[in-house]
């Protein structure tokens, strides 16, 4: 990624999986050019407390690079479903696919490393939760305690933490992509 190009590393939280979702509760993203994190929701429009989801969707659409974990399988299709105008032209980088490509033997790697704090059921998994343990950027337990029906500040904080984990994962894969590993 060139210096002037805008990369958006993002995640979203919605009220269900693709088939059932009718609302995106929040979007958080890290702008690689500005080196800044942003969060968006539709909970307090016009009160200066948040920017609307459509603003985030427009920023993502205009980015030169769109980076996230499972964004090809979930996030981008969901945005397209709920915001039909969404038509990104930037390069899409899915860290889930990079993980499967570059770490196809993840179970063996995890067994060799014998992670001190990672639960055994996460060994061999390409999930963001598993990578949070591997990279020392734990994503939190919010997802285990919610039904996803309503927005909450805890949900938005969880979304932002997912972006932090994805940033670390993107940094991990960058040497693979530029040929230095």
Enumerate the predicted regions with their spans:
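A short, aliphatic-rich alpha-helical micro-motif
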Residues: 60-61
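Entry/capping segment at the start of metal-dependent catalytic domains
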Residues: 1-29
């Amino acid at each position: 990624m060139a210096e002037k190009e805008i990369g958006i590393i993002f995640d979203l939280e919605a009220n269900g999986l693709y088939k059932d979702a009718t609302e995106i509760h929040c979007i958080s993203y890290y702008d690689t050019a500005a080196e800044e994190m942003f969060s968006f929701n539709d909970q307090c429009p016009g009160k200066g407390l948040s920017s609307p989801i459509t603003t985030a969707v427009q920023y993502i659409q205009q980015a030169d690079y769109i980076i996230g974990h499972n964004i090809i399988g979930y996030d981008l299709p969901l945005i397209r479903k709920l915001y039909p105008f969404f038509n990104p032209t930037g390069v899409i980088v899915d860290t889930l696919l990079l993980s499967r490509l570059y770490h196809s033997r993840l179970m063996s790697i995890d067994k060799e490393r014998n992670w001190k704090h990672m639960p055994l059921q996460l060994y061999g998994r390409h999930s963001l939760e598993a990578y949070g343990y591997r990279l020392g950027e734990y994503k939190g337990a919010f997802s285990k305690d919610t039904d996803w029906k309503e927005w909450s500040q805890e949900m938005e904080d969880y979304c932002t933490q997912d972006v932090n984990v994805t940033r670390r994962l993107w940094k991990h894969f960058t040497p693979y992509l530029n040929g230095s590993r």
